[in-house]
From Swiss-Prot:
Entry protein name: UvrABC system protein C
Cellular component terms per the entry's GO annotation: cytoplasm; excinuclease repair complex
Domain called GIY-YIG: residue spans: 16-95
InterPro entries recorded: GIY-YIG_endonuc, GIY-YIG_endonuc_sf, GIY-YIG_UvrC_Cho, Hlx-hairpin-Hlx_DNA-bd_motif, RuvA_2-like, UVR_dom, UVR_dom_sf, UvrABC_protein_C
Domain (UVR) ranges: 208-243
One GO term (biological process): SOS response
Swiss-Prot/TrEMBL keywords: Cytoplasm, DNA damage, DNA excision, DNA repair, Excision nuclease, SOS response
C-alpha cells in the first residue's frame, strides 16, 4: 500500500484551471480518470487525511503511485477529454462512473418529416445529425432550452405529436413560444425543416451569422420604437451566446489531426502533443528537453516531427498536423510525412476557429509542463547545491554564494525609471526581502548610471545598519538616511559579513557618491522606495527586528554586460566593500561577465549554475517590470485631488460626478463644494487649496489648424 504523501504535488504546482487528471499505479497503468473545473482544489481533496476519504477513494489513492493532469480551456472540453480517456484506458476505479452508458449526444432527426431535437445514446443512425458527446444529458437539455427561443424546433415524442395533431391543441412549449407547433399546422413542413437546418448550422459552428442578424433586427426594432420586440431579440441573442459556451465541441466529427505546441526559454523547451481522432482528443504526449544547441521554434518543431513519426506508417500519421511554427523547409517535411502515411498530409499553422482555440489549449499545457519542470528542478536540494558549487567554481569564489542578490533596471523610453532587487538564499527565492527602487538621482535614460546609484544606495544602507547595531567598536556618526522600513525576514543562510572599516563608513555617510566618469560633483542619495508603497518610521534600536538591508550577499548579479558590472563594482569600491563578488548576465545567457575581465565566462548550456543564474535574472526582470508598469499606471491615473488629506476614492468620485470634471471643480466656490454629500467645509477648503496650487493642464491644440480643442482636464482620479 502506497503512501499518498509520497507522490503528492507540491503547493502551487497544480493550476487552478479546468482540466482532467489521471492516477497511475506503480506499473504506470491508469487506474482513475477524473475531471475538474478547478484542478488545484479537486486534486487536493485526494490528499487529505485518509480517514476522511470514502473507502473506495481511500483504496484508489493508496494503490496509485503518481498523478498527472492536463489543462483545458473549458469544462465542456474537460468532459470530452475525460470521456475519451475513460474509453481508452478503462480505469479500474472508474467502473461506477456515471451510469456506465455511452455518453449522450444532441441529435436532430432530419430523416423525419418534422425533424425532432432530442438526446440520443448508443449506435448512430442514418439520417440523424449528431452533436457532442456531452458529459450529462442535462447539459444537452440546458443548451436546447436556450436555443428553442430562437429556433423553436419540435422536441416532443411521436406519441405526443400525434395526440396534439388529433386534438388540435399544441403542447405547453407551443403556448410559450418554444415550439413552432407544426403538429397543429402553425408552420408548414418546409418552414419547420428550415428551422431545424438553421439549428444544425448554429450547432456546427456557423454562429456569427445568426447573432449578427438578431442584433441587426434588435437595432431596427429599437429605431421603430418596438421596444418589447427589441428586448426579446436582445434576450434571444444572449441565449445563443450562452448556448455557444455550453455546446462547444473540440473539432468537427471527421477531423484527424495532431496538434503540437512548444514552450521554451533560453535553456529548455517543453513540447506537448494532442492526438485528435474523430474530432476528440484521444491522447496526449509531452516531454521537456535541454536546448543543447542554438535552435529556434521551427527547429524544435522539426525535431519533434522526426521523433513522433520517424517509425510510424499508415494511419498513425494523421491527415493534418498543426504546429506553432513551420519547419525551415515545410515542403520537404510535408512530403516526408506523406511518404509515411501513404497519402497527402497537411502541415500548417492554425489561423482561426476551433483548431486555433484547441492549439491555444495545447500551448497552455506546454507552458504548464515547462513551469512544473522548472519548479521540480529548482526545489531539488541536490540540484541547488550543485548549481551553487558550479557558480562558485566558475566565478572563482572561495565558498558557494548562499545569498545572491540580483538587480535590474526598468523604464519606458526613459520615463518612470525603477530598479528591482531580488534575493535568493540557498538557491531559493526569498520574496520577503525583495526591494524596489525609484531612480531619482538624475533624469533620463542611463542604465549604467542607474545601476551605480541603486548599488550605492543599497550598500550604503547596509553599512548604516551595521553601525547602528554596534557591530563596529568605533565608527563616525552616520548621516541621516532615508526612512527605514521594517523587514519581516530572518537572517540569511549565509554567514559571511562585509569587513569594511570605519573609514569606509565615513565615506558612505558623508562623502559624495560618484555616478560615473561623467559626474561633476556630489550627487545626494535620493530616498529609497521599498516594496511597501509608504515608508515607515525608523525602527527602535532595541526592537530586535532584522533591518531592511542588514545582510550582505556573497554575490551580486546585475542584468547586463560589462558596463553594468563595472558600475556595480565601482559603487562597492566607493563604499570600501571589497569582499562581495559581482557578475553580470548579458542577453546571451551563456555569457557571464566579471569586473576587469575583457572576456566573459562561458558556462555550458546544461550547467545547473547557469540555470540558477537565469532564474535569478528572470525574477529580477519580472519584479522590476511589474513595479514599473504599476508606477506608470498610477501616474496616468493621477489627479490633483490625490493630494487632499483625508479625501478618499469614494468622495473624489462624488466630487467629479457632481461637477463633471476637475476643470469645473476648480471654478467652484467652497460653499458650492460643501453641497456635495459627504463633503464638509474643512474638506472643501482643502480641495480648493489643493486645486489652487495645481496649474490646469495646457489646452490641446490641433497641429494642422491651430485650433484649441476644448477638453476637460481629467475626469479620473
Amino acid at each position: 500500500m502506497a503512501d499518498p504523501s509520497s507522490y503528492r504535488p507540491k503547493p502551487g504546482q497544480i493550476p487552478d484551471s479546468p482540466g482532467v487528471y489521471k492516477f497511475r499505479d506503480e506499473h504506470r497503468r491508469v487506474i482513475y480518470v477524473g475531471k475538474a473545473k478547478n484542478l488545484r482544489q479537486r486534486v487536493a481533496n485526494y490528499f487529505q487525511d485518509l480517514a476522511n476519504l470514502h473507502p473506495r477513494t481511500r483504496t484508489m489513492v493508496t494503490t496509485a503511485a503518481s498523478v498527472e493532469w492536463t489543462v483545458v480551456s473549458t469544462e465542456v472540453e474537460a468532459l470530452q477529454l475525460e470521456y475519451s480517456w475513460i474509453k481508452e484506458f478503462d480505469p479500474r476505479f472508474n467502473v461506477k462512473y456515471r451510469d456506465d452508458k455511452s455518453y449522450p449526444y444532441l441529435a436532430v432527426t432530419l430523416n423525419e418529416e418534422f425533424p425532432r431535437v432530442q438526446v440520443m445514446r448508443g449506435a448512430k443512425k442514418k439520417g440523424v445529425r449528431y452533436f457532442g458527446p456531452y458529459g450529462h444529458a442535462w447539459a444537452i437539455r440546458e443548451t436546447v432550452d436556450l436555443m428553442l427561443r430562437v429556433f423553436p424546433v419540435r422536441t416532443c415524442s411521436a406519441g405526443v405529436f400525434k395526440n396534439a395533431a388529433r386534438t388540435g391543441r399544441p403542447c405547453l412549449l407551443g403556448y410559450i413560444g418554444k415550439c413552432s407547433a407544426p403538429c397543429v399546422g402553425r408552420v408548414t413542413p418546409e418552414e419547420h425543416r428550415e428551422l431545424a437546418e438553421d439549428f444544425c448550422d448554429f450547432m456546427a459552428g456557423r454562429t456569427g451569422t445568426y447573432i449578427r442578424r438578431l442584433e441587426k433586427d434588435m437595432m431596427q426594432a429599437a429605431e421603430e420604437m418596438e421596444y418589447e420586440r427589441a428586448a426579446r431579440l436582445r434576450d434571444d441573442a444572449e441565449a445563443l451566446k450562452r448556448a455557444m459556451e455550453k455546446s462547444a465541441v473540440v473539432l468537427a466529427d471527421a477531423t484527424d489531426a495532431d496538434l503540437i505546441a512548444v514552450a521554451e526559454d533560453e535553456l529548455e523547451a517543453a513540447l506537448q502533443i494532442f492526438h485528435v481522432r474523430g474530432g476528440r482528443v484521444r491522447g496526449q504526449r509531452g516531454w521537456v528537453t535541454d536546448k543543447v544547441e542554438a535552435v529556434d521554434t521551427s527547429g524544435l518543431v522539426e525535431h519533434a516531427l522526426q521523433q513522433l513519426y520517424g517509425e510510424e506508417r499508415g494511419d498513425a500519421v494523421p491527415k493534418e498536423v498543426l504546429v506553432p511554427a513551420l519547419p525551415e523547409d515545410p515542403e520537404a517535411v510535408s512530403q516526408w510525412l506523406a511518404d509515411r502515411r501513404g497519402s497527402q498530409v497537411s502541415l500548417r499553422i492554425p489561423q482561426r476557429g476551433d483548431k486555433k482555440d484547441l492549439m491555444a489549449t495545447v500551448q497552455r499545457n506546454a507552458q504548464q509542463a515547462l513551469g512544473l519542470h522548472k519548479t521540480k528542478r529548482a526545489s531539488d536540494l541536490t540540484t541547488r547545491s550543485r548549481a551553487l558549487e558550479e557558480i562558485a567554481e566558475a566565478l572563482g569564489l572561495d565558498t558557494a554564494p548562499l545569498r545572491i542578490e540580483c538587480y535590474d533596471i526598468s523604464h519606458l523610453q526613459g520615463d518612470d525609471v525603477v530598479a528591482s532587487m531580488v534575493v535568493f538564499e540557498d538557491g531559493l527565492a526569498r520574496k520577503s526581502e525583495y526591494r524596489r527602487f525609484q531612480i531619482k538621482g538624475f533624469e533620463g535614460q542611463d542604465d549604467v548610471r542607474s545601476m551605480h546609484e541603486v548599488i550605492g544606495r543599497r550598500f550604503k544602507r547596509y553599512l548604516q545598519d551595521k553601525e547602528r547595531t554596534g557591530e563596529w567598536e568605533e565608527a563616525p556618526e552616520a548621516a541621516p538616511g532615508s526612512a527605514s522600513v521594517h523587514a519581516s525576514a530572518t537572517g540569511p543562510a549565509a554567514t559571511g559579513q562585509a569587513t569594511a572599516g570605519p573609514a569606509a563608513m565615513g565615506q558612505a555617510a558623508a562623502g559624495p557618491v560618484s555616478t560615473g566618469p561623467a559626474a561633476t560633483g556630489p550627487v545626494p542619495a535620493p530616498e529609497l522606495t521599498a516594496a511597501s508603497p509608504d515608508d515607515e518610521p525608523e525602527p527602535r534600536e532595541d526592537d530586535g527586528r532584522p533591518k531592511r538591508f542588514a545582510y550582505p550577499p556573497q554575490l551580486v548579479v546585475v542584468d547586463g554586460g560589462q558596463p553594468q558590472v563595472a558600475a556595480a563594482r565601482r559603487a562597492l569600491d566607493e563604499l570600501g566593500i571589497d569582499d562581495i563578488a559581482v557578475c553580470g548576465l548579458a542577453k546571451r545567457l551563456e555569457e557571464v561577465w566579471l569586473p576587469d575581465d575583457d572576456d566573459p565566462v562561458v558556462l555550458p548550456r546544461s550547467s545547473e549554475g547557469l540555470y540558477l543564474l537565469q532564474r535569478v535574472r528572470d525574477e529580477a526582470h519580472r519584479f522590476a517590470i511589474t513595479y514599473q508598469r504599476a508606477k506608470r499606471a498610477k501616474r496616468i491615473r493621477s489627479s490633483p485631488l490625490d493630494d487632499v488629506t483625508g479625501l478618499g476614492e469614494t468622495r473624489k468620485q462624488a466630487l467629479i460626478k457632481h461637477f463633471g470634471s476637475v476643470k469645473k471643480l476648480r471654478q467652484a466656490t467652497i460653499d458650492e463644494i460643501c453641497e456635495v454629500p459627504g463633503i464638509g467645509r474643512r474638506t472643501a477648503e482643502s480641495v480648493v487649496a489643493a486645486l489652487a496650487t495645481t496649474a490646469p493642464a495646457a489646452p490641446a491644440v490641433n497641429t494642422a489648424t491651430g485650433e484649441i480643442i476644448e477638453e476637460d482636464d481629467g475626469g479620473s482620479s
